[in-house]
Every structure is written in C-alpha cells, then in structure tokens.
C-alpha cells in the first residue's frame, strides 16, 4: 500500500509532468557538439502527424484493434480489413466507432535534428509516445542513434541497425515509468521491428504479449507486440 507521502508526490507529478516532458532534451544535447533542432507535436497536431508519420499513426490504430480483438470482444477481426490493407493513418477513428472508446488520449511525437550538413540525422533521434486504449502508454517508435557512428554490415544486430546507439533508451524508459505511475497507467507497450530486437527489450523488462496475434507475429518474424507492467 502506498503511503501518504508517495500519494502526494504522484499527485504533484501528475500536475507538473506532461507527456512531452518525457523527452530528455538536455541528455541529447550533451551527446553532441553541434546545435540541435527539436520538434514536438501533440494531440492537437494529429493531422500534421498523419502527414509526417502516417505509418506510425496507423500502428497506433492497429495496436488498439489488436488489443480489442484479443480481449475476447465479439467482433469480426476482418471488419477493418480495407483500412489495414490501405494502411489508413486515421484507422484509429474507425476503431473508436467500433469499440465506442477513445483510442488516443494524448500524443507526444518528439524529434531531434542535428544542425550539421555533414550528417543525415533525420530519423536517428525520435521518441513517439501515445497514451491510448485501454490504459497503456504505447511507444509507437523510438530511435536514439548516433549518426556520426555508422555500423558496418558485419556488425549489424538487425536489419535497421544502421548506427551505434546513444544509450538513451534507459533514461527515457525511467521517465516513461514515472509518468505512468503518476497518471495511473497500467502498462507500457511497444512493437518490435524484428525478432532480433526482442532480447534487447526483454533486458529492460518487456515481455511478449500472451495472445494469438503475438504468437503468430513471432513465428512469422513480424512486428511483435510487447508490454511492461507499471508498478
């Protein structure tokens, strides 16, 4: 049972800490000598996000649909097949109509771009978070790579392993946990881009979802849904 002091602290954090505060700008700045341009988009910019990162927004809707179907709800899993085939970035709106619940409760899409013409840093540093149905904090995408340190083909641990890590995931996960505890969010979730990433996320406490979709995704090498319970 939480003591009164802990309850008051969490209440204060809930008032002070916003989802966009999870992104640790100073920790990123400390990694480089050049100037860094930051961009953060929230729920009020969902249509901008649909244009900038349509695949990520699609994944949020797909994640909600997967959880709804796997919850045992009496619904045809193929009901939104056309939206899935088209990878409709606004599929979450269709999901909301079916489940009669709000899918996206808050968004924080954070990007960092290095002001150095010698490197192409777009996509190397970003953290895309969504507070969503049913009561999860979904890490829609995460990348903390050093564009100055490319990885040789023989050293790649997975297909998208193009640069060395900045080793910033751990401190961001700590911030995510803090945000979740303050806001009574029960789980942190994500989907891997390949099976090779599973051990890395397992080392941070994530587990593969225990459902039919996750088992099938693992067997076929698709994006595997994982979760971490917040305590």
Which residue stretches match the model-derived regions?
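Non-catalytic substrate-recognition and accessory regions of acyl/acetyltransferase enzymes
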Residues: 1-164, 171, 178-189, 193-198, ...
